[in-house]
């Protein structure tokens, strides 16, 4: 390339060669495309010819097979013709025998016609029997229908009576529940009346006690109650020691002789004024089914375990001056009575629930159908 293009301009010869090469490539590509398309067409024609050859071979095989089948059919037809000729000979002999049988049948027919009169009489008799049997069948069918109707009526009656029994059981249960509720309300009202009675009695006794005590004692009692708001067994002797040591216990209006007089008050006055009502309420609660007895001297914040034994029960102070004043005890009494009534209602509700549950279990154990059957048998 360098030697040929040394005496010419650079750049013209390579472009011409490139154009020639492109033309040659295009011609070769066109020739290749035309040859390949022709080759494809020829291959398709060869495939079609091969398919035609296969179809002709298959048709030839079918024709040969059909020819052999036709030859076999010709042979079989020939055999059948021979067999039919033999059958014809036998049928002719049978026909002759049948003609003889026909003659004998005609003779038998005459005999049977003679017996028809007797058979007609028998048929008439059998028809009469059939009519009687049909009537008997209809009568029995009517009886069966009546029995079925009676059975359905009895079943419905049994179901109705069982339903009525169930309704009566429900009504009796409702009445029983209402009676239990009425008894519970009556019991609570009686408890309230007794509590009010004992309250009034306690108030009357308190009035008499207040009139019997001198005027200077309540002032000392108020001072002692302020010191003994948390009732404990340790506060009682401590309060007494303070009163004895100080003489007037910090109050100038009270002297030692007044304290001596207060200590000489009878033992009945030293008891709390609501001890009767508390004692009666304690007795009422102890007789309840599930209630636990409350101590009359028990303070509301005393801890009680589930077995009813008080762990750390704080008793009311035994200070005689404080017991003579009805203020704190009368304030605590309505709360104690309210707690007593609450506990009684809870116990009553628990007993009512248990009774209701026992009634339901008893009714579930008793089948209403058996009860209805028993009632039905008694009615029959």
UniProtKB/Swiss-Prot annotation:
Residues 305-321 have a biased composition (Polar residues). Residues 1-14 are cytoplasmic. GO terms for cellular component: membrane. The modification N-acetylmethionine is found at residue 1. The chain crosses the membrane at residues 15-35. The keyword Lipid biosynthesis does not apply. Residues 192-212, 227-247, 344-380 have a biased composition (Basic and acidic residues). Keywords: Acetylation, Coiled coil, Membrane, Phosphoprotein, Signal-anchor, Transmembrane, Transmembrane helix. Residues 35-195 form a coiled coil. This is Protein GOLM2. The lineage of its organism: Eukaryota, Metazoa, Chordata, Craniata, Vertebrata. The gene is GOLM2.
């Amino acid at each position: 390339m360098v030697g040929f293009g040394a005496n010419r301009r650079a750049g013209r010869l390579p472009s011409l060669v490139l154009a020639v090469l492109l033309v040659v490539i295009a011609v070769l590509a066109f020739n290749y495309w035309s040859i390949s398309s022709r080759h494809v067409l020829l291959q398709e024609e060869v495939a079609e010819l091969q398919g035609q050859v296969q179809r002709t071979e298959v048709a030839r095989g079918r024709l040969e097979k059909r020819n052999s089948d036709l030859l076999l059919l010709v042979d079989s037809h020939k055999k059948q013709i021979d067999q039919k000729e033999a059958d014809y000979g036998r049928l002719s002999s049978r026909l002759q025998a049948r003609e003889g049988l026909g003659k004998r049948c005609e003779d038998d027919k005459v005999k049977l016609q003679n017996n028809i009169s007797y058979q007609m009489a028998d048929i008439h008799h059998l028809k009469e029997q059939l009519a009687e049997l049909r009537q008997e069948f209809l009568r029995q069918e009517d009886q069966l229908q009546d029995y079925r109707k009676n059975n359905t009526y009895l079943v419905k009656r049994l179901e109705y009576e069982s339903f009525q029994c169930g309704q009566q059981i429900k009504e009796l249960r409702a009445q029983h529940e209402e009676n239990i509720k009425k008894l519970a309300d009556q019991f609570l009202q009686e408890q309230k009346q007794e509590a009010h009675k004992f309250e009034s009695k306690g108030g009357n006794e308190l009035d008499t006690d207040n009139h019997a005590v001198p005027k200077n004692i309540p002032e000392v009692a108020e001072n002692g109650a302020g010191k003994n708001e948390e009732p404990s067994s340790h506060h009682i002797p401590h309060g007494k020691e303070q009163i004895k040591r100080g003489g007037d216990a910090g109050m100038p209006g009270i002297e030692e002789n007044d304290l001596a007089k207060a200590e000489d008050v009878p033992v009945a006055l030293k008891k709390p004024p609501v001890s009767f009502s508390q004692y009666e309420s304690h007795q009422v609660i102890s007789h309840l089914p599930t209630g636990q007895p409350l101590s009359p001297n028990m303070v509301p914040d005393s801890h009680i375990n589930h077995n009813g034994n008080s762990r750390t029960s704080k008793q009311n102070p035994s200070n005689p001056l404080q017991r003579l004043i009805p203020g704190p005890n009368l304030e605590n009494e309505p709360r104690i009575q309210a707690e007593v009534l609450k506990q009684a209602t809870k116990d009553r509700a628990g007993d009512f629930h248990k009774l209701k549950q026992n009634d339901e279990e008893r009714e579930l154990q008793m089948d209403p159908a058996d009860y209805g059957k028993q009632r039905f048998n008694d009615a029959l």
